[in-house]
UniProtKB/Swiss-Prot annotation:
GO terms for molecular function: heme binding; metal ion binding; tryptophan 2,3-dioxygenase activity. Keywords: Dioxygenase, Heme, Iron, Metal-binding, Oxidoreductase, Tryptophan catabolism. It is an enzyme of class 1 (oxidoreductase). Pathway: Amino-acid degradation; L-tryptophan degradation via kynurenine pathway; L-kynurenine from L-tryptophan: step 1/2. InterPro entries: Trp/Indoleamine_2_3_dOase-like, Trp_2_3_dOase. Substrate binds at F51, I52, I53, Q54, H55, Y113, R117, T254. This is Tryptophan 2,3-dioxygenase. SUPFAM superfamilies: Indolic compounds 2,3-dioxygenase-like. Heme binds at H240. Its cofactor is heme. Binds 1 heme group per subunit. Heme-dependent dioxygenase that catalyzes the oxidative cleavage of the L-tryptophan (L-Trp) pyrrole ring and converts L-tryptophan to N-formyl-L-kynurenine. Catalyzes the oxidative cleavage of the indole moiety. It catalyses: L-tryptophan + O2 = N-formyl-L-kynurenine.
Length: 284
């Protein structure tokens, strides 16, 4: 039976009584979720709701990214490359959503933003502890960042713990070592609290896998998944920088940074540098 009078009939078995059942709204705690948007501008500016929702949804996605990257690290700890890459694959899709989401915020014009920006005080996306947590898990660690979160003990403790723990990339190399690959000691014994930097000792092994990928497919696939992960992260950073540029130009950020100039520097930060460096060597 088709639609009559442009109305879809409710099927007889569809549940409508939720007086004693869990509903969609109660499962998702929508009362709490939808009351979490609290504009601070006075009088309330129409476009501030967009600004809040943009950042709140980003935080929700970052929560899932952190959940999946930690699960991937745990899978590497158990030498389960396939399960780890399943988590990474999901993260890659989330990253694409996060990057495209900047196009929504880009509808906020410089004039509109300037009308409520002063009400934000020193609050800034730079203070997103989940974003820093993801960076730490991926290996871009910076102990100095913890100072930003001294007033938030839970965030400070989380970042302190992640700073001291091996990154996803560290766990991967440990996994390969246990599986019999000749991973150099410099990769296995490094200071995991430091930001990851290029380790040329790894290049021969990486090149070997690329040039013999049929015999080492799981590791080869992992290399390419990591490259995707980093590229997606850099595309997000670039869209962030460009959105800020079109919205506030070269003004300083609300949190005290130089703004666009500071964001541009993030484009030089890397997670898996050997996987790009090896491309120069392949085929030589």
């Amino acid at each position: 039976m088709g639609v009559q009078a442009n109305t879809r009939a409710i099927e007889k078995d569809i549940v409508t009584d939720f007086s004693e059942r869990m509903s969609y709204a109660s499962y998702l705690d929508l009362d709490t979720l939808l009351s979490a948007q609290k504009p601070v501008s006075r009088p309330e500016h129409h476009d501030e709701l967009l600004f809040i929702i943009q950042h709140q949804t980003t935080e929700l996605w970052l929560k899932l990214v952190l959940h999946e990257t930690l699960a991937a690290r745990a899978a590497f700890d158990e030498d389960d490359i396939g399960r780890a890459l399943k988590c990474v694959a999901r993260v890659k899709h989330i990253q694409k959503t996060l990057t495209e989401q900047w196009s929504v915020l880009a509808t906020l014009t410089p004039t509109e933003y300037s009308e409520f920006r002063r009400f934000l005080g020193n609050s800034s996306g730079f203070q997103s502890y989940q974003y820093r947590a993801v960076e730490f898990v991926l290996g871009n660690k910076n102990a100095g960042m913890l100072a930003v979160f001294e007033a938030d003990p839970a965030a400070h403790d989380l970042l302190g713990r992640l700073l001291a723990e091996p990154s996803l990339y560290d766990a991967f190399w440990q996994c390969l070592s246990r599986l019999g690959y000749d991973v150099p000691a410099s990769a296995l014994d490094r200071d995991v609290t430091a930001a990851y930097t290029l380790n040329e000792d790894l290049l021969p092994l990486i090149k070997f896998v690329y040039e013999n990928h049929d015999e080492h497919w799981a590791v080869y696939e992992a290399f390419e998944e990591f490259v995707d992960l980093e590229e997606n992260f850099q595309l997000w950073r670039f869209r962030h920088m460009r959105t800020v540029l079109r919205t506030i130009g070269m003004k300083s950020g609300t949190g005290g940074s130089s703004g666009v100039g500071f964001l541009q520097k993030a484009l030089d930060l890397t997670f898996f540098p050997e996987l790009l460096a090896v491309r120069t060597e392949i085929g030589r």
